[in-house]
């Protein structure tokens, strides 16, 4: 990765993140704290970064103070932790500002935690996102040594989902003037959930099915080296079908085993723990 490419990306990202159209979420962040946004894939972690950038610019910061870097950019080759310092050096050659770091999907860089800890120790303001099993909140809190606030990002609440569909639930008389639309959207919300990208999708099921596969194979099976992935898949389906009634671990193991794939109660306990 060349110095010219990094500088080009830094400049492109500054233009992009300062112009993103946002649906503000009900999130309050404390000034001058460092954050790691973790959570489900496509829950809106990057957009929380963009929202924070918009707030900083509204407060008077220049876009040139923003050092946003997307580590999923296909123009970037595989990076090592030393490349993170190289990115910082390139920024410092471009500007005299002290940068505010926004590092998107940085878990793709091996041993990135060392760089993140050092930035915090040097009193930089830093925001980080990560969406796969390498970024479990319990482990990240330990790895980063208390230098960052771990913020769990969830899909839209119903209120946010309505806002994304141009309905302000706090507006006067909206429950009467938009009653039919609110009921319709609430039904869609409870059918498909509140992942931001599903808003406006005519048929979100196929997209959500692909997302499930990424989470299932990329996060659960790969991380925990689950050999009996069929049993895990059956267990997830049966639990979803039984969402209205409680299930014991023994019952879960029995249901899965009845399909022909034996699952012990201990394994059921482990699998549920992996999903939590």
Placement of each model-derived feature along the sequence:
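Interdomain hinge/linker elements that couple catalytic modules in large macromolecular machines
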Residues: 2-13, 160-276
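Pre-Walker A adenine-sensing motif
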Residues: 13-32
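Hydrophobic anchor at the beta1->P-loop junction of P-loop NTPases
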Residues: 37
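Walker A (P-loop) phosphate-binding loop of P-loop NTPases
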Residues: 41-42
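Conserved lysine of the Walker
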Residues: 45-46
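Short glycine-rich substrate-engagement loop in P-loop NTPases that contacts/grips substrate
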Residues: 67-99
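Structural recognition of the conserved hydrophobic beta-strand(s) that form the central parallel beta-sheet
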Residues: 125-131, 152
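Short regulatory helix/loop adjacent to the ATP-binding pocket of P-loop NTPases
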Residues: 134-150, 163-167
């Amino acid at each position: 990765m060349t110095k010219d490419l990094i500088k080009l990306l830094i400049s492109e990202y500054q233009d992009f993140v300062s112009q993103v159209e946002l649906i503000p979420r009900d999130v309050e962040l404390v000034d001058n704290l460092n954050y790691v946004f973790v959570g489900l894939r496509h829950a809106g972690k990057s957009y929380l970064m963009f929202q924070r950038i918009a707030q900083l610019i509204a407060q008077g910061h220049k876009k040139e103070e923003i050092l946003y870097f997307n580590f999923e950019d296909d123009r970037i080759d595989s990076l090592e932790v030393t490349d993170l310092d190289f990115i910082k050096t390139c920024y410092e050659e471009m500007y005299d500002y002290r940068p505010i770091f926004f590092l998107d999907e940085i878990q793709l860089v091996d041993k990135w935690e060392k760089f993140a800890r050092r930035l915090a120790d040097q009193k930089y303001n830093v925001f980080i996102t990560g969406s796969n099993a390498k970024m479990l909140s319990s482990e990240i809190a330990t790895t980063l040594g208390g230098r960052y606030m771990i913020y769990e990002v969830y899909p839209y609440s119903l209120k946010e989902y309505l806002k994304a569909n141009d309905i302000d639930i706090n507006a006067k008389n909206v429950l009467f003037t938009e009653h039919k639309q609110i009921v319709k959207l609430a039904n869609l919300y409870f059918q498909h959930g509140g992942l931001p990208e599903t808003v406006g999708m005519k048929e979100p099921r196929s997209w959500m099915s692909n997302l499930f596969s990424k989470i299932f194979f990329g996060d659960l099976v790969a991380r925990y080296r689950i050999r009996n992935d069929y049993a895990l898949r059956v267990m997830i389906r049966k639990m979803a079908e039984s969402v209205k009634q409680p299930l014991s671990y023994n019952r879960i193991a029995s249901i899965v085993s009845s399909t022909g794939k034996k699952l012990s109660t201990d394994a059921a306990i482990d699998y549920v723990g992996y999903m939590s």
